[in-house]
Amino acid sequence: MKVRASVRKMCQHCFIIKRRNVIRVVCRVTPKHKQRQG
């Protein structure tokens, strides 16, 4: 998982989740696209 200051969708399969005020990007097709803001 990458930790970044700004997260964005890297492909059309990525989707954004907000959990406990932490924004995450999850991708079922390419797990390499997982990101967390922080």
Swiss-Prot record:
InterPro entries: Ribosomal_bL36 (IPR000473), Ribosomal_bL36_sp (IPR035977). The keyword Repeat does not apply. It comes from the Bacteria. Coiled coil: none annotated. Pfam families: Ribosomal_L36. Keywords: Ribonucleoprotein, Ribosomal protein. GO terms for cellular component: cytoplasm; ribonucleoprotein complex; ribosome. GO terms for biological process: translation. GO terms for molecular function: structural constituent of ribosome. The keyword Iron-sulfur does not apply. Belongs to the bacterial ribosomal protein bL36 family. This is Large ribosomal subunit protein bL36. The lineage of its organism: Bacteria, Pseudomonadati, Pseudomonadota, Gammaproteobacteria, Enterobacterales.
